[in-house]
Amino acid sequence: MQVKQGVYAIKGVVQHYDWGGTDFIPALLGQVNAAKKPYAEYWMGSHPKSPSELITETGNWSLADRVQLPFLFKVLDVSDMLSIQVHPTKAAAALEFARENSEKIPLDSPKRNYKDENHKPELAYALSEFWLLHGFKPEHELLAILRAVPEFAGLHDWFLREGYLGLYKKVMGMPQDEVNTLLQPLLDRIVPLYEKGVLHRQEEDYWAARAAITFNRNGQCDRGIFSVYFFNIVKLEPGEAIFQDAGIPHAYLFGQCMELMANSDNVLRGGLTSKHIDVKELMKHVRCEPLEPKKLPGAWISGAEKVFETPAPDFQLSELRLNAGGEEQAFISQGPEIWFNLSGSTRFFCQERELTVQKGEAAYVEPGMAYTLLSATGSRLFKAGLPHSTKGE
Protein backbone atom coordinates (compact mmCIF):
# COMPACT_ATOMS: atom_id res chain seq x y z
CA MET A 1 0.00 0.00 0.00
CA GLN A 2 3.03 2.28 0.13
CA VAL A 3 3.67 2.40 -3.63
CA LYS A 4 1.10 4.23 -5.71
CA GLN A 5 -0.33 2.27 -8.61
CA GLY A 6 -2.18 5.35 -9.81
CA VAL A 7 -5.29 3.48 -10.92
CA TYR A 8 -6.94 0.55 -9.16
CA ALA A 9 -9.87 -1.74 -9.76
CA ILE A 10 -12.48 -1.38 -7.03
CA LYS A 11 -15.48 -3.48 -6.10
CA GLY A 12 -18.56 -1.70 -4.79
CA VAL A 13 -21.28 -2.88 -2.41
CA VAL A 14 -24.89 -3.75 -3.26
CA GLN A 15 -27.66 -2.49 -0.96
CA HIS A 16 -30.69 -4.78 -0.95
CA TYR A 17 -33.35 -2.25 0.14
CA ASP A 18 -36.95 -3.36 -0.33
CA TRP A 19 -37.71 -0.69 -2.94
CA GLY A 20 -35.08 -1.95 -5.38
CA GLY A 21 -35.65 -3.76 -8.65
CA THR A 22 -34.53 -7.33 -9.21
CA ASP A 23 -32.99 -7.29 -12.70
CA PHE A 24 -31.16 -4.08 -13.69
CA ILE A 25 -28.23 -4.03 -11.24
CA PRO A 26 -27.62 -7.82 -11.33
CA ALA A 27 -27.49 -7.67 -15.14
CA LEU A 28 -25.13 -4.69 -14.97
CA LEU A 29 -22.82 -6.48 -12.52
CA GLY A 30 -23.03 -9.83 -14.32
CA GLN A 31 -24.66 -11.53 -11.35
CA VAL A 32 -27.42 -14.14 -11.30
CA ASN A 33 -30.37 -13.19 -9.08
CA ALA A 34 -32.38 -16.39 -9.15
CA ALA A 35 -33.96 -15.57 -5.78
CA LYS A 36 -35.24 -12.23 -7.17
CA LYS A 37 -33.72 -10.36 -4.25
CA PRO A 38 -34.08 -6.56 -4.51
CA TYR A 39 -30.92 -4.85 -5.78
CA ALA A 40 -31.62 -1.21 -4.92
CA GLU A 41 -28.23 0.52 -4.94
CA TYR A 42 -24.63 -0.17 -5.88
CA TRP A 43 -22.27 1.98 -3.78
CA MET A 44 -18.81 3.09 -4.85
CA GLY A 45 -16.81 5.09 -2.35
CA SER A 46 -15.30 5.17 1.12
CA HIS A 47 -18.50 5.57 3.16
CA PRO A 48 -17.94 3.77 6.50
CA LYS A 49 -21.25 1.92 6.17
CA SER A 50 -20.21 0.16 2.95
CA PRO A 51 -16.73 1.06 1.69
CA SER A 52 -15.59 -0.27 -1.67
CA GLU A 53 -12.89 -2.91 -1.89
CA LEU A 54 -9.61 -1.65 -3.36
CA ILE A 55 -7.85 -4.33 -5.40
CA THR A 56 -4.05 -3.92 -5.35
CA GLU A 57 -1.00 -5.91 -6.37
CA THR A 58 -0.30 -6.69 -2.72
CA GLY A 59 -3.84 -7.66 -1.72
CA ASN A 60 -7.31 -6.21 -1.33
CA TRP A 61 -8.07 -3.39 1.08
CA SER A 62 -10.97 -1.22 2.16
CA LEU A 63 -10.98 1.97 0.12
CA ALA A 64 -11.80 3.77 3.38
CA ASP A 65 -8.34 2.80 4.66
CA ARG A 66 -6.77 4.53 1.66
CA VAL A 67 -8.80 7.70 1.27
CA GLN A 68 -11.77 9.59 2.71
CA LEU A 69 -13.70 10.71 -0.34
CA PRO A 70 -15.95 13.80 -0.15
CA PHE A 71 -18.51 12.07 -2.37
CA LEU A 72 -20.45 8.81 -2.67
CA PHE A 73 -21.18 7.36 -6.12
CA LYS A 74 -24.15 5.05 -6.73
CA VAL A 75 -26.20 3.18 -9.30
CA LEU A 76 -29.91 3.11 -8.34
CA ASP A 77 -32.79 0.94 -9.53
CA VAL A 78 -36.02 2.37 -8.10
CA SER A 79 -38.91 -0.09 -8.42
CA ASP A 80 -41.03 1.19 -5.51
CA MET A 81 -41.22 4.80 -4.35
CA LEU A 82 -38.61 6.12 -1.92
CA SER A 83 -39.41 8.28 1.09
CA ILE A 84 -39.77 12.05 0.83
CA GLN A 85 -36.47 13.50 2.01
CA VAL A 86 -34.91 16.80 2.96
CA HIS A 87 -31.22 17.33 3.73
CA PRO A 88 -29.75 20.09 5.95
CA THR A 89 -27.13 22.64 4.95
CA LYS A 90 -23.55 21.96 6.00
CA ALA A 91 -23.67 24.58 8.76
CA ALA A 92 -26.97 23.27 10.11
CA ALA A 93 -25.75 19.67 10.00
CA ALA A 94 -22.71 20.53 12.12
CA LEU A 95 -24.83 22.29 14.75
CA GLU A 96 -27.51 19.62 14.90
CA PHE A 97 -25.02 16.74 14.94
CA ALA A 98 -23.30 18.31 17.95
CA ARG A 99 -26.66 18.86 19.66
CA GLU A 100 -27.77 15.24 19.25
CA ASN A 101 -24.38 14.10 20.50
CA SER A 102 -24.79 16.28 23.60
CA GLU A 103 -28.23 14.73 24.10
CA LYS A 104 -26.56 11.30 23.92
CA ILE A 105 -28.85 9.99 21.18
CA PRO A 106 -27.11 6.86 19.82
CA LEU A 107 -26.02 7.06 16.18
CA ASP A 108 -27.95 3.87 15.43
CA SER A 109 -31.14 5.05 17.16
CA PRO A 110 -34.18 5.20 14.84
CA LYS A 111 -34.85 8.65 16.33
CA ARG A 112 -31.40 9.96 15.39
CA ASN A 113 -31.71 12.56 12.61
CA TYR A 114 -28.11 13.70 12.13
CA LYS A 115 -25.52 10.96 11.59
CA ASP A 116 -22.60 13.26 10.70
CA GLU A 117 -21.59 16.92 10.28
CA ASN A 118 -21.99 17.08 6.52
CA HIS A 119 -24.59 18.26 4.04
CA LYS A 120 -25.99 15.89 1.40
CA PRO A 121 -26.57 17.59 -1.95
CA GLU A 122 -27.37 15.05 -4.67
CA LEU A 123 -27.20 14.79 -8.45
CA ALA A 124 -29.30 12.19 -10.27
CA TYR A 125 -28.53 11.27 -13.90
CA ALA A 126 -31.27 9.28 -15.65
CA LEU A 127 -30.23 5.99 -17.23
CA SER A 128 -33.86 5.27 -18.11
CA GLU A 129 -37.06 7.28 -18.01
CA PHE A 130 -36.80 8.47 -14.40
CA TRP A 131 -39.57 9.95 -12.25
CA LEU A 132 -39.25 11.96 -9.04
CA LEU A 133 -40.87 14.56 -6.80
CA HIS A 134 -38.81 17.76 -6.61
CA GLY A 135 -39.75 20.88 -4.65
CA PHE A 136 -43.09 22.65 -4.30
CA LYS A 137 -45.19 23.44 -7.34
CA PRO A 138 -45.39 27.06 -8.55
CA GLU A 139 -48.32 28.86 -6.92
CA HIS A 140 -50.71 28.73 -9.89
CA GLU A 141 -50.13 24.98 -10.32
CA LEU A 142 -50.58 24.25 -6.63
CA LEU A 143 -53.79 26.30 -6.48
CA ALA A 144 -55.09 24.45 -9.53
CA ILE A 145 -54.49 21.02 -8.00
CA LEU A 146 -56.00 22.06 -4.66
CA ARG A 147 -59.11 23.21 -6.54
CA ALA A 148 -59.25 20.04 -8.63
CA VAL A 149 -59.24 17.62 -5.67
CA PRO A 150 -62.59 17.90 -3.83
CA GLU A 151 -61.13 16.57 -0.58
CA PHE A 152 -58.59 19.43 -0.56
CA ALA A 153 -61.12 22.29 -0.60
CA GLY A 154 -60.21 23.28 2.95
CA LEU A 155 -56.50 23.10 2.15
CA HIS A 156 -57.05 25.41 -0.83
CA ASP A 157 -58.47 28.10 1.41
CA TRP A 158 -55.76 27.48 4.01
CA PHE A 159 -53.03 27.91 1.38
CA LEU A 160 -54.53 31.23 0.25
CA ARG A 161 -54.32 32.46 3.85
CA GLU A 162 -51.12 30.85 5.13
CA GLY A 163 -48.95 30.21 2.07
CA TYR A 164 -46.51 27.36 1.45
CA LEU A 165 -45.12 27.13 4.98
CA GLY A 166 -48.55 27.21 6.58
CA LEU A 167 -49.91 24.55 4.21
CA TYR A 168 -47.02 22.15 4.71
CA LYS A 169 -46.93 22.69 8.47
CA LYS A 170 -50.66 21.95 8.63
CA VAL A 171 -50.54 18.57 6.84
CA MET A 172 -47.32 17.45 8.51
CA GLY A 173 -48.62 18.31 11.99
CA MET A 174 -52.17 17.09 11.42
CA PRO A 175 -53.50 14.39 13.79
CA GLN A 176 -53.53 10.98 12.11
CA ASP A 177 -57.32 10.68 12.34
CA GLU A 178 -57.67 13.91 10.38
CA VAL A 179 -55.15 12.69 7.80
CA ASN A 180 -57.25 9.56 7.33
CA THR A 181 -60.48 11.58 7.08
CA LEU A 182 -59.06 13.73 4.29
CA LEU A 183 -57.14 11.12 2.33
CA GLN A 184 -59.24 7.96 2.53
CA PRO A 185 -62.16 9.22 0.37
CA LEU A 186 -59.63 10.40 -2.22
CA LEU A 187 -57.87 7.05 -2.20
CA ASP A 188 -61.16 5.18 -2.41
CA ARG A 189 -61.73 7.00 -5.71
CA ILE A 190 -58.27 6.71 -7.28
CA VAL A 191 -56.89 3.33 -6.20
CA PRO A 192 -59.47 1.41 -8.30
CA LEU A 193 -58.53 3.60 -11.28
CA TYR A 194 -54.85 2.79 -10.73
CA GLU A 195 -55.62 -0.92 -10.49
CA LYS A 196 -57.55 -0.71 -13.78
CA GLY A 197 -54.51 0.87 -15.44
CA VAL A 198 -56.28 4.07 -16.50
CA LEU A 199 -54.01 6.50 -14.63
CA HIS A 200 -50.73 7.81 -16.08
CA ARG A 201 -47.38 8.63 -14.52
CA GLN A 202 -47.66 12.36 -15.18
CA GLU A 203 -50.79 12.45 -12.97
CA GLU A 204 -50.65 13.02 -9.22
CA ASP A 205 -53.41 10.43 -8.74
CA TYR A 206 -51.16 7.72 -10.22
CA TRP A 207 -48.41 8.20 -7.65
CA ALA A 208 -50.83 8.86 -4.78
CA ALA A 209 -52.58 5.55 -5.45
CA ARG A 210 -49.26 3.76 -5.79
CA ALA A 211 -48.12 5.29 -2.49
CA ALA A 212 -51.31 4.19 -0.75
CA ILE A 213 -50.84 0.60 -1.91
CA THR A 214 -47.19 0.63 -0.86
CA PHE A 215 -47.26 2.50 2.45
CA ASN A 216 -50.76 2.55 3.98
CA ARG A 217 -51.13 -0.05 6.71
CA ASN A 218 -53.83 -0.91 9.25
CA GLY A 219 -56.19 1.77 7.99
CA GLN A 220 -53.59 4.51 8.47
CA CYS A 221 -52.92 6.82 5.50
CA ASP A 222 -49.35 7.97 4.93
CA ARG A 223 -49.31 11.78 5.17
CA GLY A 224 -46.64 11.90 2.48
CA ILE A 225 -49.48 11.42 -0.01
CA PHE A 226 -50.34 15.11 0.42
CA SER A 227 -46.89 15.96 -0.93
CA VAL A 228 -47.51 13.98 -4.10
CA TYR A 229 -50.02 16.73 -4.93
CA PHE A 230 -47.97 19.64 -3.55
CA PHE A 231 -44.62 18.85 -5.19
CA ASN A 232 -43.49 18.98 -8.81
CA ILE A 233 -43.66 15.65 -10.61
CA VAL A 234 -40.55 15.53 -12.80
CA LYS A 235 -39.79 13.14 -15.63
CA LEU A 236 -36.16 12.88 -16.69
CA GLU A 237 -35.38 11.42 -20.08
CA PRO A 238 -32.27 9.23 -20.34
CA GLY A 239 -29.23 11.51 -20.32
CA GLU A 240 -30.88 14.30 -18.31
CA ALA A 241 -29.89 15.12 -14.74
CA ILE A 242 -31.27 17.08 -11.80
CA PHE A 243 -29.69 18.55 -8.67
CA GLN A 244 -31.18 18.32 -5.17
CA ASP A 245 -29.72 21.02 -2.92
CA ALA A 246 -30.17 21.42 0.84
CA GLY A 247 -33.77 22.04 1.88
CA ILE A 248 -35.42 20.89 -1.36
CA PRO A 249 -37.98 18.16 -0.58
CA HIS A 250 -37.72 15.29 -3.03
CA ALA A 251 -38.49 11.63 -3.56
CA TYR A 252 -37.42 9.20 -6.26
CA LEU A 253 -40.44 7.43 -7.73
CA PHE A 254 -39.35 5.05 -10.49
CA GLY A 255 -36.49 4.26 -12.85
CA GLN A 256 -32.73 3.77 -12.98
CA CYS A 257 -30.11 6.45 -12.42
CA MET A 258 -26.54 7.25 -11.54
CA GLU A 259 -26.44 9.24 -8.31
CA LEU A 260 -23.56 11.33 -6.99
CA MET A 261 -23.77 12.99 -3.59
CA ALA A 262 -21.80 14.39 -0.71
CA ASN A 263 -20.61 11.69 1.69
CA SER A 264 -23.34 11.97 4.32
CA ASP A 265 -26.22 10.07 5.93
CA ASN A 266 -28.22 13.10 7.09
CA VAL A 267 -31.84 12.53 6.04
CA LEU A 268 -35.03 14.15 7.36
CA ARG A 269 -38.09 12.29 6.14
CA GLY A 270 -41.45 13.73 5.18
CA GLY A 271 -43.55 10.66 4.52
CA LEU A 272 -43.88 7.71 2.14
CA THR A 273 -42.05 5.66 4.73
CA SER A 274 -42.45 3.48 7.79
CA LYS A 275 -39.33 5.09 9.28
CA HIS A 276 -39.10 7.85 11.87
CA ILE A 277 -40.52 11.25 10.86
CA ASP A 278 -39.42 14.14 13.07
CA VAL A 279 -41.76 16.90 11.93
CA LYS A 280 -40.15 19.56 14.12
CA GLU A 281 -36.71 18.91 12.63
CA LEU A 282 -38.10 18.57 9.11
CA MET A 283 -39.75 21.98 9.31
CA LYS A 284 -36.45 23.57 10.39
CA HIS A 285 -34.82 22.70 7.09
CA VAL A 286 -37.43 22.32 4.35
CA ARG A 287 -37.66 25.10 1.77
CA CYS A 288 -41.39 25.88 1.66
CA GLU A 289 -41.30 27.93 -1.52
CA PRO A 290 -42.22 27.48 -5.18
CA LEU A 291 -39.59 25.82 -7.32
CA GLU A 292 -39.31 25.54 -11.08
CA PRO A 293 -37.42 22.27 -11.70
CA LYS A 294 -34.24 22.75 -13.71
CA LYS A 295 -33.05 19.77 -15.70
CA LEU A 296 -29.34 19.66 -16.40
CA PRO A 297 -28.47 18.64 -19.97
CA GLY A 298 -24.73 18.72 -19.29
CA ALA A 299 -22.05 20.46 -21.34
CA TRP A 300 -19.55 18.81 -23.64
CA ILE A 301 -16.01 19.92 -22.76
CA SER A 302 -14.43 17.69 -25.38
CA GLY A 303 -15.61 15.44 -28.16
CA ALA A 304 -16.10 12.62 -25.68
CA GLU A 305 -16.67 14.09 -22.19
CA LYS A 306 -19.83 15.76 -20.91
CA VAL A 307 -19.78 17.53 -17.53
CA PHE A 308 -22.73 18.19 -15.21
CA GLU A 309 -21.96 21.23 -13.07
CA THR A 310 -23.73 21.96 -9.78
CA PRO A 311 -23.17 24.41 -6.90
CA ALA A 312 -21.86 21.56 -4.73
CA PRO A 313 -18.12 21.76 -3.94
CA ASP A 314 -18.03 18.06 -3.04
CA PHE A 315 -18.42 16.44 -6.44
CA GLN A 316 -18.77 16.71 -10.20
CA LEU A 317 -20.19 14.11 -12.58
CA SER A 318 -18.83 13.49 -16.06
CA GLU A 319 -20.09 11.16 -18.78
CA LEU A 320 -17.58 9.75 -21.25
CA ARG A 321 -18.36 7.99 -24.52
CA LEU A 322 -15.45 6.26 -26.26
CA ASN A 323 -15.73 5.14 -29.86
CA ALA A 324 -14.55 1.67 -30.81
CA GLY A 325 -10.91 1.91 -31.81
CA GLY A 326 -11.00 5.69 -31.39
CA GLU A 327 -8.29 8.00 -30.13
CA GLU A 328 -7.03 7.84 -26.57
CA GLN A 329 -8.60 10.32 -24.16
CA ALA A 330 -6.10 11.96 -21.79
CA PHE A 331 -6.84 13.09 -18.21
CA ILE A 332 -5.05 14.46 -15.17
CA SER A 333 -6.62 13.64 -11.81
CA GLN A 334 -6.09 16.70 -9.65
CA GLY A 335 -8.47 15.13 -7.12
CA PRO A 336 -9.59 11.57 -6.32
CA GLU A 337 -11.80 9.99 -8.98
CA ILE A 338 -14.04 6.97 -9.37
CA TRP A 339 -14.92 5.71 -12.84
CA PHE A 340 -17.87 3.38 -13.48
CA ASN A 341 -18.00 1.50 -16.77
CA LEU A 342 -21.66 1.26 -17.84
CA SER A 343 -21.08 -0.57 -21.13
CA GLY A 344 -18.29 -1.94 -23.26
CA SER A 345 -14.67 -2.45 -22.26
CA THR A 346 -12.22 0.32 -21.34
CA ARG A 347 -8.45 0.23 -20.90
CA PHE A 348 -6.77 2.62 -18.44
CA PHE A 349 -3.09 3.45 -18.95
CA CYS A 350 -1.30 5.05 -15.98
CA GLN A 351 2.31 4.99 -14.79
CA GLU A 352 3.29 2.31 -17.32
CA ARG A 353 0.47 0.11 -16.04
CA GLU A 354 -2.69 -1.01 -17.76
CA LEU A 355 -6.07 -1.80 -16.20
CA THR A 356 -9.02 -3.15 -18.18
CA VAL A 357 -12.48 -2.33 -16.84
CA GLN A 358 -15.49 -4.20 -18.20
CA LYS A 359 -19.22 -3.47 -18.07
CA GLY A 360 -20.36 -3.04 -14.46
CA GLU A 361 -16.83 -2.59 -13.12
CA ALA A 362 -15.22 0.45 -11.52
CA ALA A 363 -11.80 2.04 -11.06
CA TYR A 364 -10.31 4.43 -8.53
CA VAL A 365 -7.73 6.99 -9.72
CA GLU A 366 -5.47 8.69 -7.20
CA PRO A 367 -4.92 12.46 -7.27
CA GLY A 368 -2.08 13.78 -9.39
CA MET A 369 -2.14 11.06 -12.03
CA ALA A 370 -1.75 11.56 -15.77
CA TYR A 371 -3.60 8.75 -17.52
CA THR A 372 -5.36 7.82 -20.75
CA LEU A 373 -8.44 5.80 -21.67
CA LEU A 374 -8.97 3.70 -24.78
CA SER A 375 -11.70 1.31 -25.93
CA ALA A 376 -11.56 -1.32 -28.66
CA THR A 377 -15.28 -2.08 -28.30
CA GLY A 378 -16.70 1.37 -27.67
CA SER A 379 -17.69 2.15 -24.09
CA ARG A 380 -19.70 4.48 -21.91
CA LEU A 381 -18.41 5.56 -18.52
CA PHE A 382 -19.25 7.92 -15.67
CA LYS A 383 -16.65 9.72 -13.59
CA ALA A 384 -17.14 11.01 -10.05
CA GLY A 385 -14.60 13.67 -9.18
CA LEU A 386 -14.28 17.20 -7.86
CA PRO A 387 -15.34 20.41 -9.61
CA HIS A 388 -12.53 22.32 -11.31
CA SER A 389 -12.69 25.12 -8.71
CA THR A 390 -12.02 22.73 -5.81
CA LYS A 391 -9.51 20.33 -7.35
CA GLY A 392 -6.33 20.20 -5.39
CA GLU A 393 -7.73 22.18 -2.43
Where are these regions (language model features)?
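Short histidine-centered beta-strand/loop micro-motifs
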Residues: 32-36, 84, 309, 327-333
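Short acidic-glycine-tyrosine-enriched beta hairpin
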Residues: 233-243, 248-253, 320, 350-370
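Conserved short histidine dyad/triad with adjacent acidic residue
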Residues: 301-304, 316-334
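Acidic, glycine-rich loop-and-beta core segments that form the ion-binding/anion-interacting portion
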Residues: 194-263
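Transition-metal
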Residues: 1-198, 274-294, 317
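C-terminal, non-catalytic macromolecule-binding modules
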Residues: 256-307
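Ligand-binding loop in jelly-roll beta-barrel domains
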Residues: 76-81, 88-91, 116-122, 126-131, ...
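A short beta-strand-loop-beta hairpin characteristic of the jelly-roll/cupin
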Residues: 52-69, 135-136, 218-237, 331-334, ...
